[in-house]
């Protein structure tokens, strides 16, 4: 979609806010990933899976010919693929806590990328999702296929008691299946596995003295064939995988954060966006991301950090406001200007047929991945502008958590009707239900301004001050002793106009009555 239709999309994905390259890791031996492509994966030839039960049996017999008949190699895991057909089936898979990839695990990768879509699956449907599950996995009622029975050795007491060097057997399976080149020279020399670890960082040129800091709470995943591991970075970007490996690995960031939000991507039908980090040794990979990195990767990491920061700061000893709902879904639209907090995934209901008529190519996404937050990234090219936008939309999400869907539906209806009538989603401020918009936007612009100042210093920016709803009311109160927590506490579902806000503030803070009356007298006719 182009031009004006993008604007309509932003308005209909409600609460639109009309506001005035990767570098190599620093660790020794870490591969440079500067030139990794981030489009569709290109598959090569199918490979022989060394972890197939029969291949591990052959490797055992090759190294321990006298023990092969005494030690049975039984399947420990299943290499499978699922074909979910709707949102419920995707959620069922997500709740199973298994690592899903949208491409097969036993193919050579000719060209790295962030996504793959099986050519035999319709473009508007979810593609096959590949996974490795325990042999006793309780399969949900979702179409699936078992590709291989696998034996994936671990460090359990049962395996150690056999007296067999299973690491050597695993390496031999790679050799016998023609995959010796995928083994790492380090592990071949030392005959031992390595635990992947590293650090993922990002640079905000306007903060932290321009020094890199961690990409926080993001999921890091790696695999060699069907041997998987994943973990989350800590707040400083460090990670350590829970498993050891002897082969070279493919690494990726999965934008599903430990704080309870995921970042999706338009027209890529996966629950959370994936950014490949490419191939590296089993010792791990590190990466420093900057504004000159691949654009989608940079934006995803900024949105990730901004949301992590916001949610972390909602706690009692900091901002002391309700955090956004758990399992928050954010979409980044790289070709849109406007952002929104539509909260569809959490129950805000708009005429979906009407929205779909405007969404065009994006309509098919609604039935799979209803968004809560949409981030228009077209002109948000630097860290600071993206950070500001995310804070604004998450302020809306906190407000939603307090007032509920009934309030939000009226808010959305006003936005849509205002755009239809006037071409401005904020309207004229006098139409029915204008108060919902006025209060919601005042709160979001106010909190956005505070968080921007707290991150970047200087004076408080005047975001939104030219609009009819005057967010400077909250700033005025803040400067005179009512902080963001005090203000947020009165933004309840029964407060829908500036007059009701004034009354609620006076009831809650009678000692500030004079100041409250002064500011409302100045900005409210």
Where are the model-predicted features located?
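Zn2+-dependent metallopeptidase catalytic core
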Residues: 242-244, 291-332, 336-343
